[in-house]
């Protein structure tokens, strides 16, 4: 049987496609877990292929003409992993949380929409709830609208749903499961029991309130999933950055959490951010052709963006690094801190090592212009 999930993992681990260390580690984690006979979970290829096939039956209505969707390798890996891994001798799926970090224009909204459609009608759960969440209602509506576009673009799919635009609710006529858009600014603060919760652009969330609210509401729901889909950001005090660091520890093998799926596409810390080939590590969709060759036209367009960012600095450079390169940076409006350079200054010395040593303090008294 075809196994598109594992095929992509092998493509990456065998070095046949440019990738960053985090993506390599995610794929190797999949292969290592499959090879471990004592691992409490197994990978169900049939289940993975079923859900990948569902995604490829969706229709993209945006553009001049509607066209049947064809998933790329990394999308197969994500979908197949989330639905394929399950506990041995059980139908309970392995992953109850997911963290996916992709650069902008790499199919985040598609992925969220595909997952909503799958869970609402094809996952076998009756009278469930699927939530599309974000910091603001307007942003949550964007994910919801992606599902609505899939439905309106396909007459066969449209027969399975009732769409209410006025309150952003979609109801599956097969399972009576609803898909709703909810912002962090919603008036209700609890009672969110769902089978799937999409936490969109998690980097923009000032607290983990919404994420925890969704996760806690699923505690008694079998095969539920809370899925954060985001780009990198510039607030290192945000819960998303904390989750990102936690995920990196799991990928490196320093921490173990088998129920958390992780897929991060980013450049490595020592990569030159102005080298176009490095950008492909953070952009698994829009810089690649379907045959896994680099898309020279798209790279040329990104070069123009890079030139603008490099010359203008400030917000332009921040947006280029976080949104286009999917790279976390520290930015407070006045200066940009390179995290790789900052971490390179790390030391194993402690405060105890500083005792009885001279200390020098530099202060800049100048005030910024009013």
Name what the model sees in each region.
Residues 2-363:
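Phosphate/NTP-binding elements of NTP-utilizing enzymes
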């Amino acid at each position: 049987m075809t196994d598109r999930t594992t095929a992509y993992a092998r493509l990456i681990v065998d070095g046949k496609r440019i990738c960053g260390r985090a993506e390599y580690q995610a794929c190797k984690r999949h292969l290592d877990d499959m090879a471990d006979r004592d691992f409490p979970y197994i990978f169900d290829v049939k289940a993975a292929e079923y859900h990948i096939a569902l995604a490829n039956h969706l229709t993209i209505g945006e553009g001049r003409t509607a066209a049947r969707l064809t998933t790329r390798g990394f999308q197969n890996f994500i979908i197949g992993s989330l639905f394929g891994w399950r506990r041995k001798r059980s139908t309970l799926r392995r992953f109850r949380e997911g963290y996916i970090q992709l650069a902008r224009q790499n199919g985040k909204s598609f992925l969220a929409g595909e997952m909503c459609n799958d869970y609402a009608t094809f996952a076998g759960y009756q009278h469930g709830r699927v939530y599309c969440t974000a910091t603001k209602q307007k942003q949550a509506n964007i994910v919801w609208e992606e599902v609505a576009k899939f439905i309106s673009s396909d007459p066969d799919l449209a027969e399975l749903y009732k769409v209410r635009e006025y309150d952003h609710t979609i109801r599956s006529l097969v399972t009576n499961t609803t898909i709703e858009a909810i912002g962090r600014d919603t008036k209700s603060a609890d009672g969110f029991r769902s089978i799937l919760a999409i936490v969109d652009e998690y980097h923009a969330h000032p607290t983990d309130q919404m994420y925890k609210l969704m996760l806690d509401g699923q505690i008694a729901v079998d095969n539920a999933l809370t899925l954060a889909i985001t780009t990198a950001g510039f607030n290192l005090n945000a819960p998303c950055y904390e989750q990102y660091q936690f995920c990196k520890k799991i990928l490196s093998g320093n921490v173990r959490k088998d129920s958390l799926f992780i897929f991060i596409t980013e450049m490595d810390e020592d990569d030159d951010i102005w080298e176009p080939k490095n950008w492909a590590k953070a952009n698994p969709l829009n810089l690649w052709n379907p045959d896994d060759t680099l898309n020279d036209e798209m790279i040329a367009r990104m070069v123009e963006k890079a030139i603008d960012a490099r010359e203008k600095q400030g917000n332009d450079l921040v947006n280029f690094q976080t949104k286009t390169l999917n790279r976390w940076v520290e930015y407070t409006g006045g200066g940009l801190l390179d995290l790789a350079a900052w971490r390179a200054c790390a030391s194993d010395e402690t405060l105890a090592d500083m005792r009885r040593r001279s200390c020098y303090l530099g202060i800049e008294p100048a005030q910024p212009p009013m």
